[in-house]
Amino acid sequence: MSMVVAKIDWRQLYNFASRQALLGFCFDGIERLTKEFSEELKQNPMGRDLLMTWMGAAQQIRRQNMKVNAVAGKLYSKFREDGLRCCILKGQGNALMYPNPYSRTPGDIDVWVNASREQITEYAQKHFEIGDDIRFHHLETSFDGVPVELHFFPGIMNNSIYNVRLQKWFRRNADLQCSNVVSLPDGIGEIAIPTTAFNVIYQLTHLYHHFFDEGIGMRQIIDYYHVVCDFYKVYQNSSKITPSLFTIKEGSTSHPDPLTLRGEGGNRPTRCSEPLRSKVGGPSKVSPNCAGWDRRGVSGDTSSVSCSSVSGSSITSVRSASTTDPSASTALVVVQRELKYLGLWKFAGAVMFVLHEVLGLAEEKMIVPVDEKRGRLLLAEILDGGNFGRHFTKYAGFTHQSMGKKYFLKIWRNMHFVRFYPAEALCEPIFRTWHFFWRMKNKK
């Protein structure tokens, strides 16, 4: 490692971090290097101008996180007080998994509201300023100067068969995600975020969709790295479980050992610091078959838990896959079956390759086996496109073209992926064309 530090091209690293929206994250790592490799840094110092520029960017990211955290907490409280159950997707919930939650570059606030499209739209028209262009799965607005997306459902897939399955999976899991309340850093407020078991599948669908849309960047990959590591902590502690047993264990946390933020002088906010509950309308209803085996109450030896011990109706662990196989008693097996059922298995293998090659994810933490062929393709797209494909040089730089040119360039790009992901790649232009006319029809 010392040889690597001594040869770092700081300007090149800065440019890479900027393209991938990782300036705060990388600067946090540089601060660690100054403590662990001070002698090597004396031999290869960063220029003062670059250091000050980078430090300023990191401080700005920190302030942005504080702003977005405050608005997210306020927005969540507003929905809760108005009787709507919701959770905050990705974003600030993901930041809580980072060693320094202020180092992640924030984006907009994605809110999944557990209500019908009509209810959400009517509520948004009364309480927010919204445009006339409403997307199929969300509408866009802002709150206290921060961009907000109100989701009718968390995500979509291009292939209609897999999309129907995905929406059923979302509906089955919605209630528990809106009950998973966590504290934000420095006591600034609290929000509901999805459980780890939900995120390990949901955030993969998010990456998959954006891969065919405009591309994904390293920031999203690092987010998913933390999700996978968090999931590993969950299922290794109690691998034999009953996925339909989701009663709550008081005071349980995803991070049982409090971690101290460097330089913050306080405890790191825990991601599951409170028992699951609905603060509106009494106790939440725990959905059967939901992705919440990371927030369960199990007494005694969990290896002795069986489906027969669950009170009420007999529920299979992977109902969407139509199986009653008792071998699906581990969290990892359940996730793998869901990935296959939702058409995500091959892409998951590609992501595991990137997580291993770039971030050093250990094999025992992987949710599926590595797919090197698809993984190298994914990594090449990430490195060329940068954050959400904004820096593509190939495909005629399609993300910077006019709407008409972009339409055909996207088709051309996705045809490169047909032999790797035929179902999603072939359906992408069909879905995009349908979505265009749907938006025209539903303009307010």
Region spans (language model):
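Conserved NTP-donor binding/palm subdomain of two-metal-ion nucleotidyltransferases/polymerases, i.e.
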Residues: 1-107, 112-237, 329-444
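Intrinsic disorder/low-complexity segments
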Residues: 2, 43, 155, 177-187, ...
